């Protein structure tokens, strides 16, 4: 049943990431190549923030020459692997988040996206 699912059951394990010192232009290119709307920002295995395609668009063309650290969101909502899916869904709906990092001991272990959540619900019928 869906109410029994936890973050660990639906999270994306192979997460595309960037670093604070990468250029925004490189992060944008990686998002396009990987077909993702945002990248967690990792420094020495620790989650530092997230940068999204929307962040880059809102900042304008001059943002492409900045470092990811200058543009990333640092105040993140994160969950752990045991967070119930119903809690994650509530957060995503109420806050309008499209992705939520899954962390253990400050380290990124996965990512919950709207797509991964929908896929999990759709798979419940199988």
Where does each model-flagged region fall?
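Bateman (tandem CBS) regulatory domains
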Residues: 3-15, 66-76
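Short beta-to-alpha loop/turn elements within the nucleotide-binding domains of ABC transporters
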Residues: 5, 22, 51, 66, ...
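ATP/adenylate-binding site constellation spanning eukaryotic-like Ser/Thr protein kinases
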Residues: 12, 44, 53, 65, ...
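Conserved functional loop/turn residues at catalytic and ligand-binding sites
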Residues: 14, 35, 75, 96, ...
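The conserved cystathionine-beta-synthase
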Residues: 17-35, 42, 79-96, 102-104, ...
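Residue-level recognition of oxygen-bearing side chains
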Residues: 23, 46, 84, 107, ...
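Short hydrophobic beta-strand motif reused across regulatory alpha/beta modules
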Residues: 49-54, 98, 103, 111-117
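A short, polar/charged loop-to-alpha-helix boundary motif
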Residues: 56-69, 118-126
């Amino acid at each position: 049943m869906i109410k029994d699912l936890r973050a660990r059951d639906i999270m994306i394990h192979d997460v595309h990431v960037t670093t604070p010192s990468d250029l925004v232009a490189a992060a944008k290119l990686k998002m396009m190549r990987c077909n993702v709307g945002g990248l967690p920002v990792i420094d020495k295995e620790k989650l530092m923030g997230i940068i999204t395609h929307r962040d880059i668009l809102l900042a304008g063309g001059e943002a492409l020459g900045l470092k990811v650290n200058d543009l990333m969101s640092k105040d993140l909502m994160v969950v752990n692997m045991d967070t119930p899916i119903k809690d994650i869904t509530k957060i995503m709906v109420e806050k309008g988040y499209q992705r939520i990092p899954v962390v253990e001991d400050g380290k990124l272990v996965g990512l919950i996206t709207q797509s991964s959540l929908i896929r999990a619900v759709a798979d419940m019928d199988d």
